[in-house]
Amino acid sequence: MNCELCEQAAGVILWRDEFCRVVRVASDEFPAFCRVILARHVREMTDLAAPERERLMRVVFACEQALREVVRPHKVNLASLGNQVPHLH
């Protein structure tokens, strides 16, 4: 399998454990752009067991809270996209 999110950090790693990692993506347009990337290759949220989906979303919500406290943005955008790379992020 050839998956760039399996093979590369895909940004500056801010936090990681055995389940997933949080990376800061270099973006001039979105300076606080972060991704939560699953450690193993999974294409869709529904491919995860319910406890895994909940665990992943806890990390997403922790990132949102941290960004709100540190960056104080007008709005936080949460998105689940896989249109470029078929790896859950």
State where each predicted segment sits:
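HIT superfamily nucleotide-processing domains
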Residues: 1-88
